[in-house]
Amino acid sequence: MREIVHLQTGQCGNQIGAAFWQTISGEHGLDGSGVYNGTSDLQLERLNVYFNEASGNKYVPRAVLVDLEPGTMDAVRAGPFGQLFRPDNFVFGQSGAGNNWAKGHYTEGAELVDQVLDVVRREAEGCDCLQGFQITHSLGGGTGAGMGTLLISKIREEFPDRMMATFSVVPSPKVSDTVVEPYNATLSIHQLVENSDETFCIDNEALYDICMRTLKLTNPSYGDLNHLVSAVMSGVTTCLRFPGQLNSDLRKLAVNMVPFPRLHFFMVGFAPLTSRGAHSFRAVTVPELTQQMFDPKNMMAASDFRNGRYLTCSAIFRGKVSMKEVEDQMRNVQNKNSSYFVEWIPTNVQTALCSIPPRGLKMSSTFVGNSTSIQELFKRIGDQFTRMFRRKAFLHWYTGEGMDEMEFTEAESNMNDLVSEYQQYQDASISEGEEEYEEEAPMEPEE
């Protein structure tokens, strides 16, 4: 029944992945060792999208855990849900990629990749009707970015007709982890543009802001950030895991969200987000959810949609919600903010409903938007990239692993093309007549 195989690569990917599995195990009534002790049949009905049933009433995630060093894996294994995963599905090297994309993509990662693909193949064979893959990784490091994109392209070769969704943590403007982030991210985006079907962009700084401003946490830990990400991942995948009135799967989401194949980078948001103390002062209603969901402060990527326009967006409501109320609210948002939606896609807001809310909430909503303002994010990375690349700073780390400067130039120009494509569709209007759309080349971005 429409299974999804999940991969997590690198430190960031494994930590987000672990939080995700913790969240959905809870939603489906599984304990830390995968034994079902839930209360509702709805939890079991489509459990097999993400879990494989093993002997003895135990459910095992269809997850492949990959890293080039054993550290993070050991932490996952020792964590509260460490006994959930199948031991053979931990694939790790010993050397680490040292934040070097080339090591992850060409040298260290390439040595490990066949081992990973064996595990992926085995998981895929255990599926009835595989729907696709999802991968969690960061774009700033070596393993998640370099090896993650290598895996995506290899899986693409082997399963060309399956969906590929990525949850990618992009480097944030202020919070930087390593100095070569712009290189790693640009090289990764170059790959994702070609090989992924939908990429959900998440950004640490935006997550920090949500934790500080909305959740009122004084010093948020990575655990808090990962919790937010897992809430969104759980929301995006909720239609796949529970029966609902208006269900969608990865492919339906892509059909509704991706007007042009290269423009598949989404902003995500989640509501309700309230600080612990303020819970009792707010009623969670559909208007409230809709308003918070479209609030720029709620977006988990550091780009403000008010600087661009939505090509498409999708909202997934969970809980006991009336269909009519949701549709009215969504129409309301569109009418009030019509200038933020492109007018040449008439019905660009899609809604899905699922009757089962997340744990501890009456109702919630998850937002996925394809906005042209995501180009800010690519522009920012591109600028940092160019500044370093002009001076050829740190390049020897990459050329030493056998990379060519040409590859950097290609990645840079591909990203610039992406930015100008977004810009072109942001500026396009109905009235310009048909001749605009016949030319294939993206217009030059106006400086």
From Swiss-Prot:
One of its GO terms (biological process) is microtubule-based process. Its cofactor is Mg(2+). GO terms for molecular function: GTP binding; GTPase activity; metal ion binding; structural constituent of cytoskeleton. Mg(2+) binds at E69. Residues 432-447 have a biased composition (Acidic residues). It is found in: Cytoplasm, Cytoskeleton. The keyword Membrane does not apply. GO terms for cellular component: cytoplasm; microtubule. Residues 421-447 are annotated as: Disordered. Keywords: Cytoplasm, Cytoskeleton, GTP-binding, Magnesium, Metal-binding, Microtubule, Nucleotide-binding. GTP binds at Q11, E69, S138, G142, T143, G144, N204, N226. It holds the Pfam family Tubulin. Dimer of alpha and beta chains. A typical microtubule is a hollow water-filled tube with an outer diameter of 25 nm and an inner diameter of 15 nM. Alpha-beta heterodimers associate head-to-tail to form protofilaments running lengthwise along the microtubule wall with the beta-tubulin subunit facing the microtubule plus end conferring a structural polarity. Microtubules usually have 13 protofilaments but different protofilament numbers can be found in some organisms and specialized cells. Tubulin is the major constituent of microtubules, a cylinder consisting of laterally associated linear protofilaments composed of alpha- and beta-tubulin heterodimers. Microtubules grow by the addition of GTP-tubulin dimers to the microtubule end, where a stabilizing cap forms. Below the cap, tubulin dimers are in GDP-bound state, owing to GTPase activity of alpha-tubulin. Belongs to the tubulin family. This is Tubulin beta chain.
